[in-house]
Amino acid sequence: GVEEAAGAIGWEVRVLDGAGSIQGRTAAIGQALALQPAGIIINGFDAVEQQAALEGVVNSNIPMVAWHSGPKIGCDAPGGIFANVSTDAMTVSEVAAQWALDDGGTEIGVVIFTDSTYQIAIDKADRLKETVEAAGGTVLEYVDTPIADTSSRMGPLTTSLLQKYGDSWTHALAINDLYFDFMGPSLAAAGLAPDQGPQAGSAGDGSEAAFQRIRSGGYQTITVAEPLNLQGWQLVDELNRAIQGEACSGYITSPALVTQAGLEKLGDSNQFDPDSPYRDAYAKIWGK
């Protein structure tokens, strides 16, 4: 979305990879500073974790916007961030937890997966837990495992949790779709068909892989998707506002509960992209 929008506004974009580690993210911010750009977009970096590095950006007077930098969304986010673009993360968690409750009733046994590296992930997982328990459901375990290590950890974790909880484990809720990229093989190895084992639901973000699992009846039942492409356009718009000395828009996008039935209506698309003329609207704002 950012690259598409940058093409429309006429900007050059350089992508720097944080490589899924704290050190990598710090290094990427340092590289960005060295380039002396007109603006910086922080994509999925925790502002608290990277506070020292972000202070360098602020001290250099380089405008900065972010996607999912922390729990506070919208204008004037912590860390000197002009705007933090996101859906309301608490709403996303509530929608995912309510799906599990609607699906299994108050007899559900939930395992929640999160990553304490990110404050927003902690807050989302806490809201999942609060919502399930407030309705009378049971949270069997609250699992803290790094998103960056899901490929190596989720298989053994899934096997261990199945052995520990058996049929009591009815639903798996995670703060991100990535956790379910690597859960299916362990469930299959345990002899569980997709409709038999713990039903998986994600409180964000609506990846293509998740859409494909949901569409095909794989080992994920729902996700609560964000309009990621639209948010890319909003990031460019917010950064343009910062560069021009204008006010932040304050716009907050709405999430969508994505189910197999809903995807059938979408056709072949594996992306939640709202049917609205947002590209034309932003281009008009930019005078393009």
Residue ranges and their predicted role:
Residues 25, 83-110, 122-123, 152-155, ...:
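Hydrophobic alpha-helical segments within soluble ligand-binding/sensing domains
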Residues 1, 5, 9, 14-27, ...:
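Extracytoplasmic "Venus flytrap"
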Residues 42-59, 128, 147-213:
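Hydrophobic alpha-helical
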Residues 1-8, 92-96, 119-139, 153, ...:
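Short, solvent-exposed amphipathic alpha-helices that sit
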Residues 13-36, 143-165, 180-183:
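Structural motif
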Residues 135, 227, 231-288:
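Hinge/cleft segment of the Venus flytrap/periplasmic-binding protein
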Residues 48, 52-91, 207-216, 220:
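Flexible loop/hinge segments that line or gate small-molecule binding clefts
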Residues 7-18, 109-114, 129-151, 196-199:
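Short beta-strand elements in bilobed, periplasmic/extracellular small-molecule ligand-binding domains
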